[in-house]
Amino acid sequence: MKVCYTGGAVKDCGSYYSVATNAVELRIWFLTDDILRIRAGFDGDWDEASYSLTMTAWESRTDELMKDCRKRVQSAAAALTDGDRQAVIQGARLKVVIEKAPFRIMVYDKDGSLLHADIPDLAYREDSNHRRIHASQIEADDCFYGFGEKSGEINKAEKYMNMAPGDAMGYNAKETDSLYKHIPFYIRLNRGTKQAVGYFYHNTAECDFNMGREKRNYWHRYSSYRTDAGDIDLFLIAGPSIREIIERYTDLTGKSVMLPKAALGYPVSYTHLTLPTN
C-alpha cells in the first residue's frame, strides 16, 4: 500500500511543478488558465501516449498519429512560493494551495472560492490490490452530472457507479450498471452557490465512482474515484458555469462533428426493426 500522508519540496520544472510526498511524486500542469492537470505517478513512469487528448502541453508518443486533430499549447504562466507548511502556485485565474502535513491539494478561483479540496489521508493512495484511489471534498448541496451512458436519475449524488462497459442488452433503465459506454468525466454543481467544476480522470482502465454514498465521520463528506490500473491523472476544469466547463472539456478531448440532417430526430435502431408486427 501507498498513502500520501506528508508533502515535501515543490519544484518549478518549467512546464510543470513537481510535488514530493512520502509515497509518490505528483506533477501539476497549468494547461490553460482554467484547466489544471494533477497526476500522481505511482509507477514512476511518466510516459505520455494518450489517444483521448486533442490539446496538450507536453510531448506524447501519439503526437504523429494525432497530428491532424491535436493542438500543442504552452503551459499557462504561474508563480510558485514554497514554504515549510504549504506551497502556493498562483496562476492568472486559478490558485493551487498544497498543504504538507497532512498532505492535500486545494484549488481556488480568482475570487477566492474553493473549487476543489483533497481529503487528507484518502486523496492519493494505492490499496493492497494495487488500485489507485482519489478522494475529493464535497458538500450536501452538490449535484453530479456526466459519467457517460448511465441508467437512473441524472443527478448521481449518493450513487455508486461501476465503469466497466459490456453488452447490457435488455437493461433496467433505472438500476442497471454499467452500460455500454463510460466516460470518467463529471461536473459537480453546487445548488446553493450555482458554481460548477469539471473532473476528467484521464484513464481507460475499469474504475468506479462513489459520489458521497459512503460516509465516515472521521473525514469531511467526500466522493472517491478508484481505478484498477494506471495513474490518478486528473484534469480539473474551472467554470463557473456548466456551459463553460463543457466548452473547455471539449477543447481538451475534442468537439463533436455536426450530424447530417437525416440523423436528427427520432432514431430507430436495428434492434427494433424486427419487432413491429406490421
Where are these regions (language model features)?
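Conserved small/polar residues in nucleotide/adenosyl-binding loops
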Residues: 271-277
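N-terminal accessory segment at the very beginning of proteins
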Residues: 1-266
